Swiss-Prot record:
Described function: DNA-dependent RNA polymerase catalyzes the transcription of DNA into RNA using the four ribonucleoside triphosphates as substrates.
Gene3D superfamilies xref list: 1.10.132.30, 1.10.150.390, 1.10.1790.20, 1.10.40.90, 2.40.40.20, 2.40.50.100, RNA polymerase II, clamp domain (4.10.860.120), RNA polymerase Rpb1, domain 3 (1.10.274.100)
Binding site for Mg(2+): 541, 543, 545
Cofactor info, note text: Binds 1 Mg(2+) ion per subunit. Binds 2 Zn(2+) ions per subunit.
Pfam families tied to this protein: RNA_pol_Rpb1_1, RNA_pol_Rpb1_2, RNA_pol_Rpb1_3, RNA_pol_Rpb1_4, RNA_pol_Rpb1_5
GO biological process: DNA-templated transcription
Name of the protein in question: DNA-directed RNA polymerase subunit beta'
Keywords on record: DNA-directed RNA polymerase, Magnesium, Metal-binding, Nucleotidyltransferase, Transcription, Transferase, Zinc
Keyword Transcription: yes
Residues annotated as binding Zn(2+) 1: 60, 62, 75, 78
Amino acid sequence: MLDVNYFDELRIGLATADDIRQWSHGEVKKPETINYRTLRPEKDGLFCERIFGPTRDWECYCGKYKRVRFKGIICERCGVEVTRSKVRRERMGHIELAAPVTHIWYFKGVPSRLGYLLDLAPKDLEKVIYFAAYMITWVDEEARHRDLPSLEAQISVEKQEIEKRMNVELEERARKLEEDLAALEAEGAKADAKRKVREAAEREMRQIRERAQKEIDRIDEVFTRFKNLKVQDLEGDEVLYRELRDRFGQYFRGGMGAQAIKERLESFNLEAEAEALREQIRNGRGQKKARALKRLKVISAFLNTRNSPMGMVLDCIPVIPPDLRPMVQLDGGRFATSDLNDLYRRVINRNNRLKRLLDLGAPEIIVNNEKRMLQEAVDALFDNGRRGRPVTGPGNRPLKSLSDMLKGKQGRFRQNLLGKRVDYSGRSVIVVGPQLKLHQCGLPKVMALELFKPFVMKRLVDLNHAQNIKSAERMVERATSGLSRYAMVWDVLEEVIKEHPVLLNRAPTLHRLGIQAFEPQLVEGKAIQIHPLVCAAFNADFDGDQMAVHLPLSAEAQAEARILMLSSNNILKPADGRPVTMPSQDMVFGIYYLTTIKPGATGEGRVFSSDAEAIMARDLGELDIQAKIKVRLKDVVAVDDGTGSWTPPDGWQPGDPLLVETTLGRILFNEALPPDYRFINYELTKKDLSTIVNDLAERYPKVMVAACLDEMKTLGFHWATRAGVTISISDVVMPPRKQEILEAYEAKAEKVQRQYERGLITDDERRQELIEIWTQATADVAREMEANFPKDNPVFMMVNSGARGNMMQVRQIAGMRGLVANPKGEIIPRPIKSNFREGLSVLEYFISTHGARKGLADTALRTADSGYLTRRLVDVSQDVIVREEDCGTERAISMRIGVKGPDGTLTRLPTVETSVYARTLAEDVIVDGKVLAAKGSDIGDLTITELLAHGVEQVRVRSVLTCESKLGVCAACYGRSLASGKLVDVGEAVGIIAAQSIGEPGTQLTMRTFHTGGVAGEDITHGLPRVVELFEARTPKGVAPISEVTGRVKIEETEKARKIIITPDDGSEEVSYQVSKRARLRVAEGEHVEVGTQLVEGTVNPHEVLRILGPRAVQVHLVQEVQEVYRSQGVPIHDKHIEIIVRQMLKRVNILESGDTEFLPGELVERPKFEEENRRVVAEGGTPATARPVLMGITKASLATESWLSAASFQETTRVLTDAAINAKSDPLLGLKENVIIGKLIPAGTGMPRYRNIRVEPTEEARAAVYSMSGYDTGSYASGYGQFGTGSGQAVPLDDYDYGSYDR
C-alpha cells in the first residue's frame, strides 16, 4: 500500500492497453463465477483464485499449502499464490478483446472528445462505431495520382466492352424478331399477333439498353467516388463500398467499428492538426473559429500531456478486484451478486463467441453484428444507459455500471470517501441535565464502558485485577451483565474517563457548533444528558432527539478536542461573533421573575445594612424577594438602572459602600456576575440578558463568561420553579371592548361594499380598502388586548419576559385571528373575527387551514434546498484557508460606522455589527493629531464607540475582497476570528466557516413571500431563492437595466413599451433601453444620471454591473443583496463570510487575446495564474495575454476548480473525470475535500504543513512524575515517551503503547 502522507499531488490520465495488462494479474477467460456445488471460485472465471488471490488467508486453492509459513509460494498444482485473502481487494484482472472497442465516455460524453479530435459529427461517429457505415482510414494518394490515367483507360475499355456486348445482344434480338415475324407470316397470323411479338421484342431491347446504361453509370459512380476519396470519408452504402474495395482495394483502406477509429488514430498527426487549427483561429470568424477553439483545446490536451489518443480505443479491458464486486450466498441457497458481475459476464460471453466466429471464418455480416454487440456490452459495463436503453436486471431495474458506482449521493465519492463510518462511537436519546457544568455532559454507564473498553481493559491489567487482556475483556463483559463481584470495573471506568473529552454531534450538523467536546460524567440510565445552554448551538430539544458520541483517541486528538472544541470555549457563534449560549425559556422566566418589583410585597421600604441581613430577613419570612428595599452594598463599581440616567452621589468612589434602592432578587442575580461588573438594577427580559451576555463576552475571558452563564442557568431554573407559573384557560383574558371595535369597522367595510355595488370603485380597489380596514381592526383589537392584560398574568409575563411566544400568538388566542391568505397567496378580504379561546366557526376554520398546510409544505422544501445551497457553498469555498499572516496589500475598503442625525450628533449605524466589527484597520485613524486607533488593530465594540465619540464617520478596513494572497487569504485581511474573538490563526479553514454561516440559517429564510392580493408591481424573488439566484450569478426575472453612460434622460412612450433614451454628456451616440409599460421608473424626464444608475424598479443583473462598473461594484452589490435577504429575516451574518464566497466567484478571468502565452482565447483562468504567466512572457519580451474578469456562479466555480478530485466529488462526476483524464490533470491537494478523499490530514488547522513536524517533549517535572510511578523501569519509558505526537501526524496507536520500550 502506498502511504498517502508521502506524495504531494495526484495525477489522472488515460490508460493504454499496455497499462491495463501491466496492472493485471491474469486474463479472465470464462464468464463463470462460483461453482454452485463446492461454492469455490471457478478457474479462469470472474472470481478465479489464480488471478485474484486466495479466498482464505495463507491457503491455496487445492489445499496443498496451508499456514503462514508457506507465505509467497505459488502452488505448482493450482497456481495460486499463498498470501492474505485481502489481496482480493486490490488485484485486478483483464479481458483480452477479440476486436477493439471505443470508450463510451470519450465518444458519447458532451462534448464528444473523440468527435472533436477527428472532426467528426457525433452522429457519424456513432454510425462508424456501431457498424452502420464504413470509414476510409488510409488513401494512397501518390499511387492513385500515378495510376489514374491507366485506370481511366481501363474504365473506358470496360465501358466500350459493355457497349459492344449490348450491341451484339441487340443485333441478336433484332435477328430473332425478323425470324419470328417471318414464321408468323408463313402461318398467316393476324396483324394483332404480329404487333404483340414486335412490342415484346422492343421491350426486351429497351431493357438491354437500360441494363447496359445502368452498368456504365455504376462504373462512373464508383470511379468518381474513388477519384474523390479522402481519409475519413464515410460510406453508408454497403454495395458501393464492396465494389470500390474489389476494384481499387490496393489504393485505400477502410473499415467500420472501433477498428476503423483505431487505425485512424494511429495515423493521426496531432501537431499538423494543431497548426492548421491555430491558423484557422487567427483568420477565422464566428462559428468556424469557435469550433476550431474547441477542437484545439482537445488536441493541445493530447499534445501537452503524455497521453496517447489511443487510450480512447481499448484492446483489453480491466476487471476490478472481486472483493469490490462480491457474490454472497443468501439463506435459501440463492446468490446475491453485484451488478458488475452480470455486466462482465455479458462482455466475456460475447467476446468468446466473437473469437469462435473469427476462428470459424464466419461471414463478415455475422462477425460485424457480434462486434457491435461486444461494443454495446462494454458500453453498458462502463456507463449503462448512456447510449440507447439501459441493460436491465430482474424486475426491469437498470444495472449499476462502473460510472454509477461513482455518481451521486450513494456513489463512491460521497458515500465512502467523504462520509465514512467510524469506530468508537455510539448514539442515544438526549435528556436535559440541568445540574451539569457548561463543559460537561452525562454519559450512560453502559455506553461509556463500551466506548472506553480498550482503555478499561488495559488499566485492569495495569492494576493487576486481570492477568492478561483476554481475562480483562471477560471481566468487562461480566460487569456489563451486572455481577457485583466485578464492581472494580466501574471504578476503573471512572478513573479512565476522567479528563478524557468525548465529542457529541447532533445531525444535521449545519455549522461547526454541531459537534462539540464535553467532559463525560457517568450517569445511570440509557440517555445522554445535555447542558441546557448548548441546545441552541446544536438546535436540539428534548422531544426525542438523538445524539452521537465519538471518542478522540490519540493524544493530539484529545488535546484538540479539549482546547478547540470544548463547549465552554465555543461560546461565540462563528456567523456573527455573538454568544450562542444564551439563557432561554425557563431560565429567562426565572431571572425575569427574580428581578421584577412587586408593589406592596412583604417588607417593602425597609432598609438593610448588608445583603446578608436582607437574606436573613427573607429566611425568617420577613421579606419578599420582589419587595422594593434599600440595601448598603459593598464593592459597587457602578449602578445600571437600564436607562443610563444613574448619577453617583457626591464624593463616592467606585468600590466604596453605597446605599442602593433595589430588591433582594436583583442582589441575588448580581451575585452571578463578575465582582467588578456594574450592579444591574432593572427588570431583565431576554433582550436585556442577551445585551449583558454580549457585554461579558466582549470584556471577560471565556472561563469567566462560562462560569457566569452557569450561575445564571442555576438561578433561572431555581426561581422559575419557585415562581410556580401555570396557565389556565382563565388566564387568557379577552379584551372587553372587542365587539364594540369590530362593529365600528364592520360599518366601514359595509360602506365600501356598497360603493362597489354602485360601481363607484373597482373590485381591486374594494379588496385593497377592505384589507386596510381589517388590518387596522386587528391592530386595534390587539392593542386593546395588550393594555387589558394584568402585569402579573402568567401569559403576559411569559411573552413580556421573552421566555416563549410573542404578542401575535397571544393575539390569535385572546384577540382575533385577523386576515389569512388563500392557497394562491392572496389575502382573503374577510377576516377571522373569532379567537382560539372562543373557537372558530366552520368557515373560519376552513379558510385558516390553507396557510397552515402551506407552511408545513414550505418548511419541508426549504430544508432540502437550504442543505443543497450549503453543499454548493462548501464546495466553492473549501480551499480558502488562512495561509499567511499578512499579504502586505495596500488596498482596503472604506466603510461607514456612523450616520449624522438632524442635530449633528453621530449615531451608530445598525449594520456596523456585521460590517466593520471584527475587522482590521488598514490605516491609522487620526483626529486632531492624535492616533485613536492604529493601523492593523482590531475593531471591537469599544473602539467603534470611541471613534463615534470623536466624530469619525468612516474608516478604511482590510477585506478578503482585496487580499492578495496567492492561495487562500491572509490573517490581516480576514481580521478577527468571530468564533474565538482573537485574530484568526494561520490554518483556519475560513472558507468552510463562511459556507456554514451562510447555509445554516438557510432553513429560516422563507421560500415565497405572500403577495398582498393583486398589488401592482413585479413580484421580486425573496428569501432562499433570492440567495441562490445571487450566488449562482443568474440573470434575475424582471431585470432592471442600468445606465451605461453619464447623461440626460429622455422618455419616449410607444404603443407597446416605453423607451428610456440617455444622451451622453460627451456627445457620443445616445443609448436607449426598452422597458415594459408596467415597470415603475426610477428616473424622470430630463434628469441627469451617472454611469450605473438603475433606471426602473426591480433587480439588476450582476453581470451587467461587472461589465459597466467593474469588479469592485459587483462585489459590493452581491454582499449587500445577500445581506438584504438575511436582515429581512432578522438573521445576523458578518459580511466577511459573504465576501469569501464572492471572492471565489470572481476568481477567474476570461482570456480575450492570448498573445504569446499558452492560454487559448475564451479559456477561463484563475487570476494569479494569469498574472504569473503574463509576467513570465513579458520578462522574455513577448506580448502578454489580455482578459476580462468574469463572475461565475458557485456551481460553475466549484466545477472549474483546479482540483479534479474535489470537482468530481461535487457534481457531474463522469464529465469531470473524462475531462481531467484527457488533460492529464494533476491535483495539487490544496483543498480540504481532496485530502479527505485520499485519506491525508487536511491542510488546515493542526494539519497544516507548518504545524505538522512538531515533536511533543515532556517537561522535566513530567518526566520526574513518570519515574515515580511504581513498578516501571525508568529508562525504557523515557525512551518511548519522546515518540508521542511525532511529526508523522498519525494517531498514536494506543494498544501499542504498553508503556514498554517501543521504538519505531
